[in-house]
Amino acid sequence: MEDKFANLSLHEKTGKSSIQLNEQTGSDNGSAVKRTSSTSSHYNNINADLHARVKAFQEQRALKRSASVGSNQSEQDKGSSQSPKHIQQIVNKPLPPLPVAGSSKVSQRMSSQVVQASSKSTLKNVLDNQETQNITDVNINIDTTKITATTIGVNTGLPATDITPSVSNTASATHKAQLLNPNRRAPRRPLSTQHPTRPNVAPHKAPAIINTPKQSLSARRGLKLPPGGMSLKMPTKTAQQPQQFAPSPSNKKHIETLSNSKVVEGKRSNPGSLINGVQSTSTSSSTEGPHDTVGTTPRTGNSNNSSNSGSSGGGGLFANFSKYVDIKSGSLNFAGKLSLSSKGIDFSNGSSSRITLDELEFLDELGHGNYGNVSKVLHKPTNVIMATKEVRLELDEAKFRQILMELEVLHKCNSPYIVDFYGAFFIEGAVYMCMEYMDGGSLDKIYDESSEIGGIDEPQLAFIANAVIHGLKELKEQHNIIHRDVKPTNILCSANQGTVKLCDFGVSGNLVASLAKTNIGCQSYMAPERIKSLNPDRATYTVQSDIWSLGLSILEMALGRYPYPPETYDNIFSQLSAIVDGPPPRLPSDKFSSDAQDFVSLCLQKIPERRPTYAALTEHPWLVKYRNQDVHMSEYITERLERRNKILRERGENGLSKNVPALHMGGL
């Protein structure tokens, strides 16, 4: 009852303070939630947030900012609320305690009513609206400085709140009590209404946010992998000498060799067990019946099978994608294009490749990204070292399209400037692509902004530019394909062969239907016309955008770092503004020739129509100068990698730390 009386003495100032405290508490809770969500490693959340920021930047460029209004009004309201008349009526009382985090919905709703009643009503309005209250006797306890009531009617609009006012003496307290109790007759309390005793409100405590660990990949795909990763090692036997491919523009010979290799078949009692050190991951029905290779469309009734299969096989993971996944045969089908299974890949033109997981021996991990890992493996039947790219399917239809595009590009393009493709297979929710192993890795491994390594020298830079341009030119002229994601991490090099090749065609597109999707590729290397476009879906993505990305990549390899100012790295909008509004970066004149500077300047023209074509770039004097020269690329890559590994051993680190811009995106 004392709490009910105390609620009547609440002033508007106290209500505002309570609201401010609640707002601060809410903001703290919100920040806690944001911090928790920021630790998620889910690629879709990170990508969605980045796209939202880019979209906000585009809208800011189209709209004029108006002067902020309302600040004067807020100052006037603040001044009026703190006028001398109001200050005299304020009773210095502590804020009411906040509700318990685990309290019921009723208590939360009643607490919100107290805040609303305290903040929006003056003392007079509160007294006039409380017609159900019946205060018959008031006792002032000076020792405890609490105002108590012996008899008080229950007010259903205001919950019980423990408020301890500051009372200096008996006279002042009695005077205040009289002011709060005008001489008027209160209505009788209804006899039929019974109200339960409300519990005491405990101090507010922020709800604990429980970070539920995401289910592991092996658990989601039904695999029981060892802690160290996928084990593909065989028992000790006669050592075989691994072979490396000689530089060759075609992989036809090796594909035929792989097609003739035998597949070890047989039922296994435990699909997730390790047999002879080889991870057994055979899919359901793959060894009990013939593989569905008639066409590339799923059989009739796959939709029903997927809905009724539950969690068996791949049904639980791909229940909504029956048009791609054939549950009965355990295959991944792209209508009219290709079909993937645990035994290999079949293309619609009749060509096929037979590589299985049992034939691969894991050697090392080359890299990892948001959708999977890249591993160095040995194909035991042919004794060929390969690189397997694992792409996990996360119920994202866009990922299916990326897999289809990359497999099509790799299959169609036999070029000395594009990585060779050996085959692919599909097992338990992941696609494994077997490609040529490039022992030098991506080009970002052979340059650094530190003085110990530095950027790539001009002769080798011209060799790299020539190889990349020829690869992009073949994609465009022979296959009508644009890459859309040209950057140093998607360009591979081989120290053994001294070659440079393009890879990663997941976001590539056909020029016939080249309407670009929003923010395809890495935003750090995106052309300015794509960033500032308000409707990128309607803007046709041309090869000119790839030429901008090529120029920016060459400049980064020359400098050893991302070419835009480091002060823009931490702010996405600053980096976008530098790309769109700022002048394009240039090669330093003291280290590079005028021909090299002119080549980069042509690629980084802000107006797309002013950028040269691939044919014009191949005949540029800078590339012609070094075309017939031996730049000793193999020795150069080897020396750079050895220098890098030596630095890492001395520092005891796994990789060189780099100042990465905010727009950089990881992935495979």
From Swiss-Prot:
Name its species: Saccharomyces cerevisiae (strain ATCC 204508 / S288c)
Give UniProt keywords alphabetically.
Antibiotic resistance, ATP-binding, Cytoplasm, Kinase, Nucleotide-binding, Phosphoprotein, Serine/threonine-protein kinase, Transferase, Tyrosine-protein kinase
Residues binding ATP? L366, G367, H368, G369, N370, Y371, G372, N373, V374, K389
List cystine links: none
Q: Where is the composition biased (Basic and acidic residues)?
A: 1-15
Positions of post-translational Phosphothreonine modification: T518
PTM text: Activated by phosphorylation by SSK2 or SSK22. Ser/Thr phosphorylation is also necessary for SHO1-mediated activation.
Task: Give one GO term, molecular function aspect.
Answer: ATP binding
Record PTM Phosphoserine, positions in chain? S68, S269, S514
Domain Protein kinase as annotated: residue spans: 360-623
Similarity comment: family membership: Belongs to the protein kinase superfamily. STE Ser/Thr protein kinase family. MAP kinase kinase subfamily.
Q: What is this protein called?
A: MAP kinase kinase PBS2
Q: Which gene encodes it?
A: PBS2
Query: What EC number(s) does its UniProt record assign?
Result: 2.7.12.2
Chain residue ranges for the region called Disordered: 1-43, 61-120, 181-313
**UniProt comment concerning the protein's domains:** Alternative way of activation involves binding the proline-rich motif to the SH3 domain of SHO1.
Q: Which Pfam families match?
A: Pkinase
Where are the active-site residues found? D485
